[in-house]
Amino acid sequence: MAHAIDPKRAALLPLDLQQDNIAGTPGIAEKKILANIARLLEAGRGKRMPIIHITASVRADYLDMPRSNELWRALRASKKLILGTPGAEIHPLVAPRSDELVINKTCVDPFLSTNLGQALINFDVNTLIVCGLWTNY
């Protein structure tokens, strides 16, 4: 059974589309991942849906990241996704526009360390369309 999405009550959440993540993920170009997400963003913009870009980046001293998570421990060792560095920037092909929110998370779940929940309430959203490189976490 197909479910209709009401664009007035839906938001698009592109996750973790930062330069360091893209450089570390094989097959991006071959699978046309960024091109497909860019098309999805344009469709959402055409429907005037809220678009909330979620990034994952931390301080250079890593004091704001969880130490108990294996994924984040690996990040610390890699010296990547540091706030203010080119690697933490969203790729230009899927970059936010000035009227779109960018919310940075410092843990795997964007609801735990951000104001994402409040933003969705503010937009009166009841449906999320999630896309990105690592959406299985």
Regions found by a protein language model. Give the residues of each.
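Internal catalytic-core helix/loop-beta-alpha segment
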Residues: 84-133
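Active-site acidic carboxylates
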Residues: 1-97, 101
